[in-house]
Structure formats: structure tokens, C-alpha cells
């Protein structure tokens, strides 16, 4: 599942959930639910995250 990729990217970049949530302008608990696969992440936030981590959307959602 791609939510694992969100976690890996965050850890690889030495970021906290709060830092990513601040960038997305959302609550840390909400971001945590995205990262844990509890809540579906909106496409607009996926685009922001792809830009933030400088990766493609395909990479982010593990589409090969």
C-alpha cells in the first residue's frame, strides 16, 4: 500500500508527522491517519506531497 511509501519518505527525509502536516496545512492526527492507511488521502494532498519530496505521483502511489 502506498501509505507505507509516505512513511518511508518522511523517515528518509528526517521529518516528523507534524512537519509534513504543517506543509500540507492539516492536523497532525489527520496526517497520521493518512500515513497509517486509516483515512484516504485527497489527490490534492498527494500532488503536494509528490512536489514536496520531489517524486512522481506514480512513485508515491507505488504505480510501476
Enumerate the language-model features and the residues they cover.
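DNA major-groove recognition helix of helix-turn-helix
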Residues: 35, 53, 64
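Alpha-helical residues within the helix-turn-helix
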Residues: 11, 22, 51
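A short, Lys/Arg-rich alpha-helix, primarily the initiator
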Residues: 1-12
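Short alpha-helical DNA-recognition segment
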Residues: 15-33
